Amino acid sequence: YLMGRELEVDGVFDGEDILIPGIMEHVERSGIHSGDSISVYPPLHISEEHKKTILEDTKNMARELGVVGLINAQYILYNDEIYVIEVNPRSSRTIPYISKVTGVPIVEVATRVILGEKLKDMEFGTGLYPEASYYAVKMPVFSFEKLTDVDIAMGPEMKSTGECLGIAKTYPQALLKAFKGANMKVPKKGGRI
């Protein structure tokens, strides 16, 4: 187990080039299932150097795994080092989220790649897609009030039953919208959520 900041990417690899629409940063501590984590795009706490490392590492893993199409990778940033914690040569639950918030139709792009097109010949380019000028927060939704025998402690097993999305010009506004979308009561002053 590594403490640190968890990061996640979805990408498309065509055998030569990769397109990563965006890097998502998890808000909670590492070790929480990614489906149960609050996630923010664009990431708040990583350097351009770390973004380049994630881009190159994801590209290299896709090449070594023989991926043509979608890839999902999860990382931890700990003591200024990037560590791979999981890589999946497939789609993930974050594909609709990152597609919506970046405007990159990832499934369509991956399908075109699988059918033989090259990323460099498409309108979205290669590498890390330019970041948006707004923030998007993916918020898990839980049903603990209906599933009363479920342990509510967060860990590596997913417990959420849905997700919602908050989008705004600032991170605090996007986070507030996401909390409201998940029907969480947010105090106007002080308190805890």
What residue spans do the PLM features occupy?
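ATP-dependent carboxylate activation and anion-phosphoryl transfer catalytic cores
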Residues: 1-191
